[in-house]
């Protein structure tokens, strides 16, 4: 199969470490109070899978569900890399218009990508409504500059998250991202060593 094929096998078998499971199942859900907290991992083609979940007892499990790459457009993925924690308090909010719509000095649209109060895509809002979700929290898991996955929390009524908790979530996501990189780098090294031994 060669080194590349073996590396792909190694990547598929890399687990989410025990410390990350704790972050999802205890720290994040207990800390934030959301009804459901999930971890998505993206494959090389951008498709996602939920492989860790903590939820209220009355909710149906989503663990193991797969989602097509089209559920998260490329533009949204780029924004997740720039602004790594996003909170939506109430999906039924009324957006406030930006006045003026264009920058007076350049005539260009204002870059709102780093703004926490930036409105969300109408398509995404409808997607959440279709699932019955009212409030969300999303934190990016980034490895070596690419979007590895997401920590996503759903609530079925409006939920506000104060700034201090957002910062804690950001820190926990960064810790998880560092751990993910360490686990995958170790797995890749082990696969490379195994292939080297087989080729000798």
Q: Would you name each region that the model predicts?
A:
Residues 134-142:
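Short hydrophobic beta-strand micro-motif common in sensory/regulatory domains
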Residues 24-33, 38-43, 52-55, 128-129:
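Short regulatory alpha-helical segment in sensory/regulatory domains of signaling proteins that mediates
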